[in-house]
Amino acid sequence: MVGCVSEQTYDAEVQKSALYQQLTAKLQTELNADEAQIKQLQGQVKLTLVDQLLFAEGGWQVHQKGKATLAKIAPTLSTAAAKRIVVEGFTDNVPIGPALKSRFPSNWELSTARATDVVRILAAEGVPQDLLAAEGFGDQRPVASNDTPQGRAQNRRVEIVISDLAQ
């Protein structure tokens, strides 16, 4: 039969979907709407955190408020039964200023440093290191136009992608 799935496969998919829904609901109770956007996608949950929640303007190290936010979600991430948690860093297309140019030649390096700092903090808060990875995309994956201040603000973000949940 073409297009049929076994009852066992169907039940496993229903259980997995329920796990993603539970994770999404738990994260929504831990974070305010102004702190993060949470989306449940096919096979993953994505948290989008705006850069000012985590970093000083042009900075790459997570500030105290950002550390507090990450500490709030770390226990949930630690117990999420995920096989992979990828922290992705993104920037706008404004070139790196002279103060940071020697450390970060481009937005690519800045976005990677931001993602890496978030990973370090999550690991320090108890998220298993073997689940964590950091990736930087610079200005290569904008979610809004870089032609306006509002669009650039949307593009400066960190996304935490939780995937491969197991029962």
Where are these regions (language model features)?
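Charged catalytic carboxylate motif
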Residues: 19, 69, 114
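Short small-residue beta-strand/loop micro-motif enriched in glycine and branched aliphatics
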Residues: 6, 55-58
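Soluble periplasmic/extracytoplasmic beta-strand elements of cell-envelope proteins
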Residues: 37-39, 44-54, 84-88, 117, ...
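Periplasmic peptidoglycan-binding/anchoring modules of Gram-negative envelope and division proteins
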Residues: 25-33, 47, 58-89, 93, ...
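Extracellular/periplasmic catalytic domains that process cell-envelope and extracellular macromolecules
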Residues: 39-41, 69, 79-80, 127, ...
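Bacterial Sec signal peptide processing site at the extreme N-terminus
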Residues: 2-22
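Periplasmic OmpA-like peptidoglycan-binding domain that tethers envelope proteins to the cell wall
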Residues: 59-64, 90-167
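Heptad-repeat alpha-helical coiled-coil signal-transmission segments
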Residues: 17-20, 24-27, 31, 38
